[in-house]
Structure formats: C-alpha cells, structure tokens
Amino acid sequence: LHSKHGSVPRAVPGITVGHEMVGIVAEVGSAVSNVKPGDRVTVNVETFCGECFFCKKGFVNNCTDQNGGWALGCRIDGGQAEYVRVPFADQGLNKIPDGVTDRQALLVGDVLATGFWAARISEITPEDTVLILGAGPTGICTLLCVMLHSPKRIIVCEKDASRLQFIRRHYPQVLTVQPEDCAAFVRAHSDHGGADVVLEVAGADSTFRLAWECARPNAVVTVVALYD
C-alpha cells in the first residue's frame, strides 16, 4: 500500500508485489551453498550482498547492490506468484525447522524480524519504561521482542478497542492506554518524566509527534513504521 500511495520513491511500477513469503526451493544458482532444492524456507524482506560498507556495518537495508535492500516486491518481482527469484539466496533464505509451520514461519521474514531489530537497537535495560505506539501485527511482534529484554514496565498505546482487548487478554502484565490519554498516562507510570524508550510502530503523523511528547529527556526513540 505504501508503494501504491507513492510513498516508496524507489518502487518500480508494474512489478509483482510481495515481500513476506515462505516457499520451497526449486532451483539454486552455482554460487548458492546454504540451501538446496526441496528445502522449505523463509524469505527475508531485505536482500543484501554482505560485502558493501553498509552490509558490513549491519545496515543491510541500505545495501548498495542494485538488488539489495528492499528489492523484492519493490524494485524486482516479489512473492505473489508461483515462483520468485531471490537474489543473494545464501543471505536471503532461511531453512524452516520441521516443527515450525509455514504460517508460523511467515512472520520471520518481515514483521517479527522488524520487531526484533527495533527492540535490539533501542538499548532497553531492566530499569526502563518502554512505550510502544501501535498494536497492529508489527506492533505486537515488537512487543514480543521488547519483552525478551525484560524492562521494568511496558506500555502499549492503541486506539482500536479490539487490539487493546487482545493485549490485555494475552499480556496482562502490559499496561495499555488510548492515544488521547497517553502522554499523561506515561508520565504517571514512569520514573523520570516520560518513557525511557519509545518505539513508534503506528505510522501516523499524530503518533510520530506523540512519541516525542511521551519520551523523557535523552530517551531513545525508535521509528519502526513507514509513513505515507
């Protein structure tokens, strides 16, 4: 949808979309050694060469190869088709263990990996109050990955009542709040005048502003969402 709305400048009109997928390897090129035909695999949303300056720094989304970064479903044909060619397959494909279903593995290629990376770079400590703005699929995956860091307190802000109910039912230890009450709620439930870490996963102008309103001085604010 971001591509359709014109919010992805590098998107190529007319390509086959689809960047979240699992599949079975049909063929491999001569340089591929990590997977073989018949392997069940996830496909990373980011393809990357592993050799350029940004790849070596870990910023694979900025891979300088023409088929690197967000290429699948954006600049080259993606996964909403019977077959898809995945560049840099040794880095871009991951074997799925036998005990993991396709449905479960599908999350690994994008939304869960996005949440994992966002939580990792947010420098979360056990003393922190962490605010997550947005409880859609990526927001919930971000919540799961934030929980791995065991912060003192997690607050989820979401306007949709059904999503808030989902959080309360499955994660009763997590505090929840609606956007109109968020800033005051965070101040009342934090130790230093605001959240120590804010992860913005909603992608709206209003939530981008709210992230900074809820952050304490010298907080970490991680922008996870894309914006139209």
Where are these regions (language model features)?
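Mid-domain Rossmann-like dinucleotide-binding core that forms the NAD(H)/NADP(H) cofactor-binding site
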Residues: 95-184
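Glycine-rich beta-strand-centered segment in the early N-terminal region that forms part
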Residues: 5-56, 97-99
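Glycine-rich cofactor phosphate-binding loops and adjacent beta1-alpha1 units
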Residues: 122, 126, 147, 164-228
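NAD(P)H dinucleotide-binding glycine-rich loop of Rossmann-like/cofactor-binding domains
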Residues: 51-133
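Buried hydrophobic positions in well-ordered alpha/beta secondary-structure cores of metabolic enzymes
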Residues: 23-25, 38, 52, 84, ...
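Structural detector of well-ordered beta-strand residues that form the stable sheet scaffold
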Residues: 22, 42, 131, 155, ...
